[in-house]
Amino acid sequence: MRQEKDSLGIVEVPEDKLYGAQTMRSRNFFSWGPELMPYEVIRALVWIKKCAAQANQDLGFLDSKHCDMIVAAADEILEGGFEEHFPLKVWQTGSGTQSNMNVNEVIANLAIRHHGGVLGSKDPIHPNDHVNKSQSSNDVFPTAMHIAAVISLKNKLIPALDHMIRVLDAKVEEFRHDVKIGRTHLMDAVPMTLGQEFSGYSSQLRHCLESIAFSLAHLYELAIGATAVGTGLNVPEGFVEKIIHYLRKETDEPFIPASNYFSALSCHDALVDAHGSLATLACALTKIATDLSFLGSGPRCGLGELFFPENEPGSSIMPGKVNPTQCEALQMVCAQVLGNNQTVIIGGSRGNFELNVMKPVIIYNFLQSVDLLSEGMRAFSEFFVKGLKVNKARLQDNINNSLMLVTALAPVLGYDKCSKAALKAFHESISLKEACLALGYLSEKEFDRLVVPENMVGNH
């Protein structure tokens, strides 16, 4: 162990770790739970430190030597392999200050080590005076939250969602001529095609994609430059424009300064809104997974309209059983995301005066939702949807047995006669055609001309 000193006194820190006294204090006092600060947030914080150093150098507030040391250390961390030096939990101060200082300390100590200094000496790089220059945890951490959210959405979720839409579109085309019985209220309805049913799923997800893409606009707004309460105290003129320039260059994302710094610190409506779009996606995916589970139920004693891909044995006691496991896994993912949404909403509501103090739990749940949905959609698309096949014989049997084909006769016979024919067929367990013939409503030839399921599916 080595000894480091902060404003409260001496702290012992593991000799081989790059973090310092403030990180160690957080480890000592906030050690519960397995949930670490997401590394996406750590990467975003490192980007901010690198870009802040460059901005401060450009403005003459940091000399080139110190800037180069900070940039070199940041780049090395961004290359990977430093995860063990960022051990802090989500459950810490609500401003994220401890994680901000964790990053400051690691960058400073890495730079010190590279230049032959003593870890924890703060010489020649000081974690506050140099690495955190022109910044406050109160504006740095929300900036990191937005950067992490944008990059996760664009690199993970949006590609996975787009992929699932394309997989569903392929099934729309594959199933376009497979006529089946539609269902409303879980009961038999009029005919449609399986392709039409899948087009509804694809449309749902397209709307979700549009909503998520729209939510990015406010996530591009960054709080950096607000410092402690939004007034920009201790921020040199021109700093915001400079650091935003470097962040855009570093991330290749169109970040802009927040339109209002006071709201940027005190609330996280942009993340609440964006996660609301993720919750909508979870609702849509739950509906789709549930429908497909039921459509393939059986295989002999259920609906049985779809054949599931045989990925793994479904039961430890019943041989030969194949279950909709991907559907169930995705439904659990969606349940978690909907729970996360409530946490994000509650967290967003805790903006006490000038600072929201639930920042870590908001971004933790947001990023978990992105990861779960992204991975869940890819697995569901690849291992389930792509392998779905139609049970054409079952579709035809259902059509032949459906009483709702009587709807096609309503313009000819009227509602009352059609109801009587359908009820007669149901109560006597005969076909609709047999009921119409027995009642003398139509001849067999007339019935066959009027009741053609393929002509009842429309052009949608």
From Swiss-Prot:
This is Fumarate hydratase class II. The keyword Lyase applies. GO terms for biological process: fumarate metabolic process; malate metabolic process; tricarboxylic acid cycle. The active site is at H185, S315. It is found in: Cytoplasm. Involved in the TCA cycle. Catalyzes the stereospecific interconversion of fumarate to L-malate. Substrate binds at residues 95-97, 126-129, 136-138, 184, 316, 321-323. The gene is fumC. Homotetramer.
